[in-house]
């Protein structure tokens, strides 16, 4: 029996809010679903989403079994139960793995031999957000095609109820996940590591994993607290990175590793307190992997440094890098398609495959691999490994506000303006635009090897801006200033989340 279409405007504190599904259509993103709760979705709406996911599973011929987990937010458990109610209504058996990291949920597909996964999480979004990451083909998660079809099923009320659904509570997945991460590896050198969790879900995992491999752990906000009393756990944000840097300086640690709210991303600070942006950390890891697996293919997202293409160590080991669309689902799929050894995103998603991972993004797996890297270089510090890279000057990820319903149109106009600017011989930071790559937004390649990127965020009402210079901090800032002047021509651009 088909469902009724949900109400597309959420009316909080009304009679219907407690009974009828209400879902803002903007929550269906390119590769997952995210809403402000309860302003953009209610619990009956989440039940309708579960019914839609279950209906899509039947439509795609996926066996009716799914792993379901939730992150550590005060409302995530209620949302998970609503989602599982809808999945069960669709005739799906839900294997409830309990509170989890997103990569633990992905791991559970392999551990429990299940075809599908649904993880209730808002990822690194701040409190007040919720969402679901889902996938029907391990280790992959939904991309734009699957998300568009899911959106249509849910918003048109095409979910179909079936018999046979149920919920099974599964214990032991967390212990199995940690054991899988640790394996038989033990550090052979002393290593003092600041473990930064921002009081998010990773606090239940990070210290245990690092201690199990023999690291001396310096805890930083490793108490579970869903109010996030210090800051939102996001290792791409300078606030968290600065806190990690201060902890390194105060403790004399060898490095700091920080995790986001659902543990699929991580960030690194070296022994001097320098923040290593995730794309640069990826080059350090790629160099290490290249020596172990020469001839490997890597994937980097379009926000990442140009060093993947120019690094002499990667070239010496006959390694190649494919630049691809930003987004965890895009990157997972690209790594899978190319048979790449690893993929790296500037946001801190790393996709380790082949002999070093299963292809999904797992901050805990990366933490272990970073420690292994240090173990393979016993005479070097993290700053030594960082300083061995060619020096470039890169902004953090900068995100000006732009409404969800307007950001893609605004981006198209910005790209058109950039193309005219380039055609007329215009410059960014005094450097002529050599090429504009539009695989994901616009990445302007400059004559001296610098670049500037503007794209639309897939997860939040923002654009995303990054610039890099091989010459100087001043040129990096000048590139940003010139790009921002073009961006600001659009009337619907708001304030940046952070500035350089």
Features from the language model and the residues they span:
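Gly/Ser/Thr-enriched, mixed-charge loops and adjacent short helices
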Residues: 17-23, 130-251
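Short glycine-rich phosphate-binding loop at a beta-alpha junction
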Residues: 63-71, 95, 192-194, 296-301, ...
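Glycine-rich phosphate-binding loop
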Residues: 115-129, 248-270, 275, 322, ...
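Phosphate-binding and adjacent anionic-ligand microenvironments
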Residues: 293-466, 471-500
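An N-terminal, well-structured beta->alpha segment
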Residues: 2-85, 89-90, 116, 167-193
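Glycine-rich phosphate-binding loops at beta-strand->alpha-helix junctions
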Residues: 71-79, 197-204, 304
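N-terminal small/polar loop signature for handling phosphorylated ligands or for N-terminal nucleophile
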Residues: 55, 63-129, 179, 208-269
